[in-house]
């Protein structure tokens, strides 16, 4: 058994909560939790605790929810905890240098990609969007930059041809906690070996937007198919048909050519809706029309065949 560390945990969503749960099952002591302030959620816009706060309260762990760390009070609260280390996972607040320097061993972060490949807010989505063969989690010593700290541990896994951001999120949420526990064991034993990042290899994983998710049929079919998976579950790749916004849940690339303009429907039957792109043909397999759940193309065509007639130009 490695030395027990006094840990302050900072995180907010479910991804972070799974890492907190792993820490609570380890030999380490979680002495406090930092998470974002309760936010309105649901139809009633009722103030709702984050998944991390929920777990912390279940285990009687003190919870701190500052809007930021600008006040002397917030800084002093953290200092008074006398933590060995702060573990940060999808916290959502920028940490100033004074916070990074407060725990004896500084702050470490679990990042959802193989650094330095994707720094920034949407590394899971961008790895699929770009067609990367693998992804993973990187645990790094935090510095004042955006995901620029020295790397302490990397765990990898392949990106399968069927992976969406939703499925990859689940995989990384399972991979990260084990990597974190291993990394903390190395830190506690004084065996951690920081590796500097090569800035030349870094890309910025910018946030996704609904505008970006609108399909441009002039793109390559392979790129559109990756976007469909990368933008699932949000913001969802979409296009217009019969003046309705249609979300694409599943598609595949068909290696065929056509002299028809991009966006033209070549074929529409139970095997899919075949659409000309800038390079290749994209076959739409599962769609969602306004007010309905996602359905197979066969079911869509049973009720809305007129929207997808051969020769129709999608926009």
Curated annotation (Swiss-Prot):
(6S)-5,6,7,8-tetrahydrofolate binds at residues 113-116. Pfam families: Formyl_trans_C, Formyl_trans_N. It catalyses: L-methionyl-tRNA(fMet) + (6R)-10-formyltetrahydrofolate = N-formyl-L-methionyl-tRNA(fMet) + (6S)-5,6,7,8-tetrahydrofolate + H(+). Its EC number is 2.1.2.9. GO terms for cellular component: cytosol. Disulfide bonds: none annotated. SUPFAM superfamilies: FMT C-terminal domain-like (SSF50486), Formyltransferase (SSF53328). GO terms for molecular function: methionyl-tRNA formyltransferase activity. Keywords: Protein biosynthesis, Transferase. Belongs to the Fmt family. PANTHER family: METHIONYL-TRNA FORMYLTRANSFERASE (PTHR11138), METHIONYL-TRNA FORMYLTRANSFERASE, MITOCHONDRIAL (PTHR11138:SF5). Attaches a formyl group to the free amino group of methionyl-tRNA(fMet). The formyl group appears to play a dual role in the initiator identity of N-formylmethionyl-tRNA by promoting its recognition by IF2 and preventing the misappropriation of this tRNA by the elongation apparatus. This is Methionyl-tRNA formyltransferase. It comes from Vibrio campbellii (strain ATCC BAA-1116). The gene is fmt.
């Amino acid at each position: 058994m490695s030395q027990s560390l006094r840990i302050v945990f900072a995180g907010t969503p479910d991804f972070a909560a799974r890492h907190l749960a792993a820490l609570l099952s380890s030999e380490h002591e979680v002495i406090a939790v930092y998470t974002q302030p309760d936010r309105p959620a649901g139809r009633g816009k009722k103030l709702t605790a984050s998944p991390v706060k929920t777990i912390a309260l279940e285990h009687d762990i003190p919870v701190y929810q500052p809007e930021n760390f600008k006040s002397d009070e917030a800084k002093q609260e953290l200092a008074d905890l006398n933590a060995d280390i702060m573990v940060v996972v999808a916290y959502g607040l920028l940490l100033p240098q004074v916070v990074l320097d407060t725990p004896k061993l500084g702050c470490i972060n679990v990042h959802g990609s193989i650094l330095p490949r994707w720094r920034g807010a949407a590394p899971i989505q961008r790895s699929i969007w770009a067609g990367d063969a693998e992804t993973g989690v990187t645990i790094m010593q935090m510095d004042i930059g955006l995901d620029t700290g020295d790397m302490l541990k990397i765990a990898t896994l392949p990106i399968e041809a069927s992976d969406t951001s939703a499925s990859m999120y689940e995989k990384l949420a399972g991979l990260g906690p084990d990597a974190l526990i291993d990394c903390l064991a190395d830190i506690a034993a004084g065996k951690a070996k920081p590796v500097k990042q090569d800035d030349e290899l870094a890309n910025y994983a910018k946030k996704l937007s609904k505008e970006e998710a609108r399909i441009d049929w002039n793109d390559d079919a392979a790129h559109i198919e990756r976007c469909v998976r990368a933008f699932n579950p949000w913001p969802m790749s979409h296009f217009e048909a019969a003046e309705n916004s249609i979300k694409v849940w599943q598609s595949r690339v068909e290696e065929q050519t056509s002299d028809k303009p991009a966006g033209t429907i070549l074929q529409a039957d139970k095997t899919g809706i075949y659409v000309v792109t800038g390079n290749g043909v994209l076959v739409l397999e599962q769609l969602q029309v306004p007010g309905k759940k996602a359905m197979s193309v066969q079911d869509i065509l049973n009720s809305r065949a007129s929207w997808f007639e051969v020769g129709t130009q999608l926009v």
